[in-house]
């Protein structure tokens, strides 16, 4: 991949991987490919899309209402995905769906993901994001993961 020929969004994604992810020692080829293939910007609330590749947590606001939840910084999401050492035969339970981006990354690496989210607004947001990105192996459930699943 040649950085000088990429459109702006792809350049930003490339820079995120090269300047944030790799320096955090996320080097697993499957995780890196997931970061290129799963469109992070499409999981970020529209008002914050310009910050999709920034090295910071992003507040998850739904219709200008703060849910008091955030998307993790990209390097944290990538490191979590790498440390799980997932294979295509794995099934994953994620507690706290948020925007659905981490679930989509995990779904890229595993066979099936069930993600549990307590906030019904975020369940709807995540389901829309996953559907828009044709992620079919992630199921989002409404519930409190602290109570077991």
Residue ranges and their predicted role:
Residues 81-149:
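Conserved nucleotide-cofactor-binding alpha/beta core module
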């Amino acid at each position: 991949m040649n950085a000088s020929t990429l459109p702006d969004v792809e350049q930003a994604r490339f820079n995120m991987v090269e300047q944030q992810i790799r320096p955090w020692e996320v080097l697993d080829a499957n995780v890196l490919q997931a970061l290129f293939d799963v469109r992070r910007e499409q999981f970020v609330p529209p008002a914050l899309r310009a910050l999709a590749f920034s090295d910071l947590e992003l507040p998850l606001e739904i219709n200008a209402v703060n849910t008091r939840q955030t998307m993790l910084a990209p390097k944290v999401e990538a490191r979590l995905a790498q440390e799980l050492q997932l294979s295509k035969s794995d099934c994953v339970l994620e507690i706290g769906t948020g925007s659905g981006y981490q679930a989509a990354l995990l779904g890229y690496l595993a066979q099936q993901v069930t993600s549990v989210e307590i906030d019904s607004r975020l369940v709807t947001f995540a389901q829309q994001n996953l559907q828009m990105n044709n992620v079919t192996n992630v199921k989002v459930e409404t519930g409190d993961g602290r109570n077991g699943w």
